[in-house]
Amino acid sequence: MAKNPNKKIQEEYKQAIKFGCVVCKKHYGVYTEPCIHHLTGAGMGIKSKSFIPLCFEHHQGSQGIHYLGNFTWEDKYGTQEELLEYYEKNK
């Protein structure tokens, strides 16, 4: 069972929610309410810092990374690392 995130991580998640979906913001210039996507392979725990905010559609929907798969999704929207860098620079 995953541990609850500490207060610092919770604040980072709140900031990500205020930022919105990184794909919607970067590609379409709009705010869309996100959920937290941990970069593939990162999991939880120490690496839980490696996350990007994604709306449902870009996370689990028909245009989502979990639906399309990493290769197709990243070909369309950029790598998760590129989006993380964009998010970190613009939050």
Say what each PLM segment does.
Residues G43-I52, Q60-K91:
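Polybasic, low-complexity binding patches
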Residues E12-F19, A42-L54:
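Phosphate-binding glycine-rich loops and adjacent basic patches that engage nucleotide phosphates
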Residues N6-C35, E57:
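Short cysteine-rich loop/turn motifs with clustered Cys
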Residues V22, V30-E33, H38, A42, ...:
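Acidic/histidine-enriched, beta-strand-rich ligand/metal-binding domains
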